[in-house]
Structure formats: C-alpha cells, structure tokens
Regions:
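Acidic, Ala/Val/Gly-enriched low-complexity intrinsically disordered segments
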Residues: 9-10
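Auxiliary alpha/beta "docking" domains used to position bulky ligands
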Residues: 13-198, 237
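Short, intrinsically disordered, charge-balanced linker/junction segments flanking boundaries
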Residues: 278-283
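A short, flexible beta-alpha/helix-coil linker loop
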Residues: 190, 231-232
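Immediate flanking context of iron-sulfur cluster ligation sites
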Residues: 191-200, 242-251
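Iron-sulfur cluster-binding cysteine motifs and their immediate structural context
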Residues: 30, 204-227, 233-234, 244-274
C-alpha cells in the first residue's frame, strides 16, 4: 500500500509540474508543447529503413537509424520527451514584386529572420532552466533539427499535430508553419495522446509539387525535392534548373497549397522580417 500511495503522490506531483511547464512554455514564446514517452520509435525505424533502401535520403540527417529511433541511446536516464513548436510567419508585408526587368529571388519562409536554431535554442534553454529550478537533479538533453532524433516523429507522438502527405507535422493552430524541437528528460511525465486527424482524400500538395518529390504516405524523395536541391553542392541536373525558377533557398509550394494552412500567420517579436533582404533583386 505504501508503494502504491507513493506512486500516486509522485504522479500527482509530476502532473502539477507538467502544468507549470506548459504555462511557463507559453509565457516564453512557445506556441505548442506536448509530452511523450522515451520509448523507441519502432514504426519510424521501419520507415527509415525503407527510405534509405529506396535512395530517398538527403544525406543531411543522422545516418545511424538506431540513434534516430531509440531516445535512450542519447540519454540513458530519459523517461519522457517534451516536444515544442514555435510558429513562424508566412506572409511578408511590403514585399517587392518580382516583375519583368526587376526579378526578385525567394527564400523559404522557415529561413526568414533570425536563424531558427538560435530562436529554438533560447526557448529550450529557458525551459530547461525552469525545470532544473523545480527538480535540481533532473537530467536533460535538448535537440533542434541537428539532433539525432526525428523532430517530426517526436512532435507527432507528443500530440502536436499529425503528419500530412507533404511530410510536415500539421498543427490545428500553426498549420505546417512551425519550428520543432524537443528535450529528453529523466522525469516520467504522463504522455499526451497523438492527434487523430488526417489529410482525408486531399492530394493537392502531391499534385502541385514542382518536381514530383512527394511519393505518398508523407514520404519525400529528397533527391528530387527543390528544398534539398537548393542546399546541395553537387551537380544540378538540367531537368531541375528550370523548375527551381527564382527560388534561392528552399521551396514552400507543398505548404502554400495546403488547405490546413489557410488563415494562419503566426508572429513573434524575435522573428524580424526585412523584405528587401528576403526578396533580393536578381542580377
């Protein structure tokens, strides 16, 4: 009985701490936060093995599939993962028009403003400090994009959104326009439920992808994706040069056409946009 009562008390304390973490997260500019276990991502492991076998990988992500799918290889004491999302703007006020004689380039919206790794890192550091104040002996490891875990798989399991046919996590509040990050923690929080939603019969993103890079079930052939092609240093095949058009970095087509993104344009004070820089004149 004493063990049972101890577990009940511990659960109540962790639920109280969870609510405090959520409230604090919102106060520092984190738009969405969710909790999941530190269990392996077995379904993702199978998908990644198929992905690599088909030659779809970009080469930018961690190549060790075990590291990508087994959180405790990164932090052995991990009991939970806290996933966060920060929305970014997708509309540019006062943007110069691209017209004949004054052609303008385009950057993917995720690259607008300050480097998003810095934006996310500051928030994760503040959140980690807050948790350490409450639980001094907690062990934490934070990750943003360049970490070994799949940000999208963590976010989906933590209930931040569902994976759309364009491969992005689609949130009811943020659409696909969000930066994702996570932290492994040695505290056993109650996990949140994944979001039960889907794209239904909609295939607009698949149909409108300029290079046919979306291959179904949320999978992407990175070798054909313009976002990857504008970042690779390898030889660019002629068939893709025309399709890239005036894109200088990245591609947002599969997000721009997504019906789930209608009416969404999240703003934050530390994401400052400069139209002349974001739509530069092409020589």
């Amino acid at each position: 009985n004493s063990i049972c009562n101890f577990k009940k008390v511990a659960k109540l304390m962790n639920n109280k701490l969870k609510k405090e973490i959520i409230d604090f997260a919102h106060s520092i500019g984190i738009d969405s936060i969710g909790f999941t276990t530190a269990d392996p991502f077995d379904e993702l492991k199978q998908k990644l093995e198929e992905y690599h076998a088909k030659g779809y990988a970009s080469g930018f992500e961690e190549s060790n599939i075990s590291l990508r799918t087994e959180p405790k290889l990164s932090l052995p004491s991990a009991r939970s993962i806290i996933a966060i999302a920060v929305g970014y703007p997708n509309k540019l006020k006062g943007a110069p028009k691209s017209v004949k004689g004054d052609r303008r380039g385009m950057f993917a919206r995720a690259s607008w403003g300050q480097d998003y790794h810095s934006i996310m890192r500051k928030r994760l550091d503040k959140l980690a400090d807050f948790i350490k104040e409450k639980v001094p002996d907690v062990e934490i490891q934070s990750m943003v994009d360049t970490g070994v875990l799949s940000d999208r798989a963590v976010a989906e399991r933590a209930g931040l959104g569902f994976t759309g046919r364009n491969g992005f996590v689609i949130s009811p509040e943020l659409g696909t326009w969000s930066y994702l990050g996570e932290m492994l923690v040695s505290i056993p929080f109650e996990p949140d439920d994944p979001l039960l939603d889907s794209c239904g019969d909609c295939t607009i993103c698949v149909d409108r992808c300029p290079t046919g890079a979306l291959v179904g079930n949320g999978q992407l052939n990175s070798q054909k994706c313009i976002s990857f092609l504008t970042q690779t240093k390898g030889y660019l095949q002629d068939e893709y040069r025309y399709k890239i058009g005036n894109r200088l970095y990245g591609c947002d087509t599969c997000q721009q056409v997504c019906p789930k993104n209608r009416g969404i344009n999240t703003q934050h004070d530390d994401i400052v946009l400069e139209p002349e820089i974001l739509k530069p004149r092409l020589v």
